[in-house]
Amino acid sequence: MNQYLVIGGFLGAGKTTSMIAFAEYLSARGLRPAILVNDLGSRSLVDGEFTAASGCFCDEITGDCICYQTEELVDRLRRFRDSSHADIVLSDIPGCGIGGLDHVYHKLAREYPDEFRLCPFTAVADPERLRAILPEQADLNLPEEMRYLFDAQLREAEVILFNKIDTLRPEELARDMAFLREHYGHAKIFAMSARSGAGVAEAADYLISARSALPEVDVGYGGPEFLAAEQRLSWYNRKFFVRKTDGIPVDGNAFISDYFEAVRTRLQAVQRNVPHLKLFANGAGEAAKASLLGVDYGIEFDRSFSAPQTELRCAVNARAACESEVLDFLMDAALRDACRKFGWKLHVFFTECFGMTDEGNE
């Protein structure tokens, strides 16, 4: 019986990084893990490319949440089992997603009762997003409606992974863990850092040894609070190629940073935010991956170029609290400005931008 683990949680909390960290740990234990990346919109998403570059067995389900693609999900799980001989499959759901416990786990248990061993339904939280639901309710320049999604994701989780603890002082970690235990005491809570590896082994060992109890949790899916939150979010995906026509290499990391700064400036000008902007770029024999987790935060590089580049093949994804028409315009303008500054010739292969509740997208 295949083991299957779904990991949800906040936009930018580190779901993909956590899955990769777990996969690397489980591989070292002699198991064969696989990762199934799920998001809305097109194929060739940043998370899929980054996961594949890590060396893990990886596939994607795109176009919609796995909550609504059960037959496709089961087909991929079987393929991992039969072709890759995977012992366990880890998959995420989009960062705005709730209801996965019901729509994924309960449905699999009903319709495929003897085929999959379901690990505890899991959510990743991070210190910055948690600040929005702490008693002081910090202002993260995100719509008020986002607090509902953050809270709902934790309420339906059987396991909470409190990630990025390497960014906290000991007293901050103690405060946040006390809050999680008080308000989400139904869940098993692990403190960890997927980036540094702290706490990864303990969490992974528990997740693969325990089974989901399949609790019934009403998180208000489809209700007015859910719809109000979804209405504030837009998705942007683009694939593009840039090349130096003069052949003189430039700093690819600086180009990515300038592009992100141009996006930040434009979002701030219209008082909008991007809970998660991410880019994966393939250059000459190496790759870079960068993220921006909001207009008030610094740019983070999970991987950077070690040498100047003359051409880059890039995928960029943005999940923004912004109208889709505004987001589409400012993302394009920011990229073209950065390309002009660095002397890149730009070729756009694919772009899509949509609001979660845009007409025709429901």
Where does each model-flagged region fall?
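A short acidic, often aromatic-flanked loop/helix-cap motif at beta-alpha or helix-coil junctions
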Residues: C65-I66, R195-V200, G285, G355-D358
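P-loop NTP-binding site
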Residues: M1-I7, G12-T17, S209-E362
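Short, aromatic/basic amphipathic alpha-helical patches
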Residues: D47-S54, A174-R181, L330-R336
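Non-catalytic alpha-helical coupling and interface elements of nucleotide-dependent molecular machines
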Residues: T16, S27, L31, A109-P113, ...
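Nucleotide-state-sensitive switch-loop elements of NTP-binding domains
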Residues: N2-G8, A13, T17-Y148
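Canonical P-loop GTPase G-domain recognition
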Residues: R147-E230
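A structural preference for short, hydrophobic beta-strand core positions in alpha/beta folds
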Residues: I35, I189-A191, V348
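Helical mechanochemical/support elements of P-loop NTPase systems and associated helical scaffolds
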Residues: Q3, Q69-E72, G100, M146-Q153, ...
